[in-house]
Every structure is written in C-alpha cells, then in structure tokens.
C-alpha cells in the first residue's frame, strides 16, 4: 500500500521538469547564474533514473544457437531490452527483442535466481534452482525475428510471494527470464525433451532461453533498486 501514498508525489515529479526548464530560461534571460537551477535539474534527473529501470536479458549460452535467428553471425546475436516504469499502484514492463529465430514461442517469468553471473557468463555456483517463479506472459517471435511484450504488475522492489503453510517467508523475485515453450525447439542444442521444465502453462516447457544478470555486489536482480547491504546476503529494501 506504500505505492498509493506515493501517488501525489509522482504527480509532482512528472510536473517538475517543466518548471525546471522555465527556471533555467529565466536565469539565462536575466543574466543570472543558473548553478542552483542546474543542480536542481541534476537532482531531478537522478530521481527519474530510480523511477525508470532499464536492463538487458542475455542468452543462456548452451542454447543460444537454437534461439538465434542468425546463429553464425556474432554481430546479430539475440538481444532483448527491458524497460520498467515505476507507478503509484503498479509498474509497467516493456520488453523488446530482436534477432530471435522466427516462429519460436516462449514463456516469460520473474524468478528469484538467475543462472548467469554479472558478466553474463554461466555462474559456476548455480545449482539448477531458479527459486520462486511467477508466470508473467507469453512471447512469440515474429517473421522478422522480433519479440514484444508489455505487462503491468508489482515489479520493482516490492515484488514478493509468501506461503505460511509451508513456512515460506516473503520472498522476492527480482530477475526476468523466458523459457522455450516447446521442448523440441532446443533438441539441437542438447536438451532432452523427455525431461521438460515446468516453465509454461502445461508445465512441459523447454530450457531457459534468456535471463537478466545480477548486480555484481549485491547479487540481486535488476528489479531491486534499493538493496540493503547491511545484511548478508543483501536483501531488497522497498
């Protein structure tokens, strides 16, 4: 409910860039020194960077060739950009990808853990458990090799689930990834379709295709923008 309390603040934040521009213009017109105005503008820009979060998803290395539209062209490797805008009641996520093999279908999840390190290489400490996972959307690669998705839900900092019946405390899922919907789509890269993963509506999906990377210091995913490093491991502090 803390987002509702922020609603009036968000309205003022959206209005502030206009008066900042007016203040700068007035300072210059009157021959004044706009240092204070510039400092205010820089502060506003810094705050806006907290309201809009951008990050990339990276291919799961073992299955990149089965994912790629141009598997032999390193200059046209699969790429996906994610933009999340913080809202007063919920957040909006926009996903845009290209150079994906046309016709492939995927399933988008928010997950607790990623199998990649901060440099997008496979994390040697990963043991196959993505932790808490929530199904968010389907993805379809177009004839041009593009994928798009848009969702609205709680994503930044306050994204969590819990279940007291199994003693699961509130647990965040701050990574974003998507899985091959069809297990057979990744056979050419060594996936055994007789051992599907649960990452689609039928719980018979293929392997992970692309996923976000964690922060190098906190090891939290990009959906956490306020990390509390006073604890070990670090946790997200809304």
Q: Model-flagged regions — what are they?
A:
Residues 2-3, 18-19, 39:
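Long, low-complexity, intrinsically disordered N-terminal extensions of eukaryotic proteins, enriched
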Residues 31-42:
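Signal peptide processing junction and immediate N-terminal pro/mature segment
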Residues 1-15:
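N-terminal secretory signal peptides that target proteins for export/translocation
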Residues 40-238:
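N-terminal leader/targeting pre-sequences
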Residues 21-32:
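Bacterial N-terminal signal peptides
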């Amino acid at each position: 409910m803390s987002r509702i309390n922020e609603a009036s603040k968000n309205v003022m934040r959206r209005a502030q860039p206009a008066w900042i521009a007016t203040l700068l213009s007035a300072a210059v017109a009157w021959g004044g020194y706009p240092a204070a105005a510039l400092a205010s503008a820089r502060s506003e820009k810094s705050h806006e960077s907290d309201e809009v979060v951008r990050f990339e998803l990276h291919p799961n290395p073992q299955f990149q060739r089965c994912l790629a539209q141009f598997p032999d062209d390193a200059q046209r490797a699969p790429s996906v950009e994610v933009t999340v805008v913080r809202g007063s009641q919920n957040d909006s996520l926009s996903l845009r990808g290209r150079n994906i093999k046309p016709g492939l279908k995927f399933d988008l999840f928010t997950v607790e853990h990623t199998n990649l390190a901060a440099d997008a290489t496979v994390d040697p400490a990963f043991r196959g458990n993505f932790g808490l996972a929530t199904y968010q959307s389907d993805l379809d690669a177009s004839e041009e090799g593009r994928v798009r998705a848009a969702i609205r839900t709680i994503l930044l900092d306050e994204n969590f689930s819990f279940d007291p019946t199994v003693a699961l405390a509130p647990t965040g899922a701050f990574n974003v990834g998507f899985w091959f919907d069809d297990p057979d789509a990744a056979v050419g890269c060594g996936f055994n379709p007789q051992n599907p993963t649960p990452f689609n509506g039928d719980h018979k999906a293929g392997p992970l295709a692309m996923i976000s990377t964690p922060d190098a210091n906190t090891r939290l995913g990009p959906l956490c923008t306020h990390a509390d490093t006073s604890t070990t491991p670090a946790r997200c502090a809304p």
